[in-house]
Amino acid sequence: MAITNNVGSLKIQITNNNFFPIEGASVYISPTGMPDSTSEEFVTDENGIVIDEELPAPDVAYSLEPGENQPYSEYNVLVNAPGYNERFISGVQIFSGENGIQNIELTPSDGSDTNPTVLDAHTLWEQYPPKIAEDMIKPVNPSGGIVLSRVVIPETIVVHDGAPTDPTARDYYVPYKDYIKNVACNEIYSTWPDAAIRANVLAIQSFTLNRVYTEWYRGKGYDFTVTSNTAFDQKWVYNATIFENVSQIVDEMFANYLSKPNVTQPLFTQYCDGRRVSCPGWMTQWGSKSLADDGLTAIQILRYYYGDTIYINTSETISGIPSSYPGYELTIGSSGDKVSQLQRQLARISLNYPAIGTVTVDGLYGQNTADAVRKFQQIFNLPATGVTDYKTWYKISQIYVGVTKIAENV
């Protein structure tokens, strides 16, 4: 989607708590802090989607160097649909030239008042507590510590939305990829060079997988994986806006993490902004952006900060997925069991998203399958090629698992 200067776009996707898109919902978008402004009204299509391509935003230059000007504009989103409770989200972030994605789940009407969701400001703009330093490599057996024998990509991250010791903070169960996308969109700007985004995503993933692998908080008696408190972990914001380019990078790289020779655990790759806070031996976010401007690749940026011996590793074990990627793209002319598996999953997803169309399960990747894949990609924010690549395969698997699990629990 082409976006002109000083505007960004927002794609709002509305579902109910059974993962069905809500058609005909009224969506109102207005700038925050401007009570007299006129709200733009939209109505969701059969996929529960509306897109506003013309939301004013500050000059992109504000997000490319630290400064005194807020680099994003903020909007309110109000959603009404017959039979559902109203939702109001304030603080939706829009960057010039970027495609934002706002997922909103509606719950059945129960007569309760609207409970506004106010999104936190970005970490590079707002001041948050600096990270308390920890070792990059954890002791192997601190009082019965590390128990996993291999690195596993978890299906779900349990996020404690506060400090570890805060018993009033809510725990959220978040799909792993969604957690990584959320953190990345709250820790760095989506306007940065591709190499900088990739370097930071890899650091975020390795940080997270170290928490998973070491069972860091469970070993301390807590029932969560990570916190949202920046003094202890990474910034995660409930219902935050996700940016399309960051989302696609995570879909491509989600099974990767950072390693050193002869070390099994993912490295605990800590970082800071590098301007308001200094952190020798860690990656700095603004520094990674400068190195990307100079032409360094993601791994070169990471080695600059974490040492020449680190390398990108890949987990072969992805939890909660019915079948692993075949190792090659599926496209028109492909055939076999993997195509049949893909078709079965698409056919099930199409019960929730009829726009995907009727999918014939015959093990032959023809035009019908390619069209269904293309429509799926359009709905779920992937490049619409009609080809099932790595990121499409695992996105289809994720959505399939989501709709079937919910259906089983209804």
Predicted regions and their residues:
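Structural motif
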Residues: 5-23, 32-34
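Short, solvent-exposed loop/turn segments that connect beta-strands within catalytic domains
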Residues: 33-36, 68-70, 352-355
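Conserved, single-site charged/polar hotspot
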Residues: 1-3, 24-28, 43, 47-56, ...
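Short glycine/proline/serine/threonine-rich loop/turn segments at secondary-structure transition edges
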Residues: 59-73
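Short beta-strand and strand-turn-strand segments in soluble, beta-rich domains
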Residues: 30-39, 86
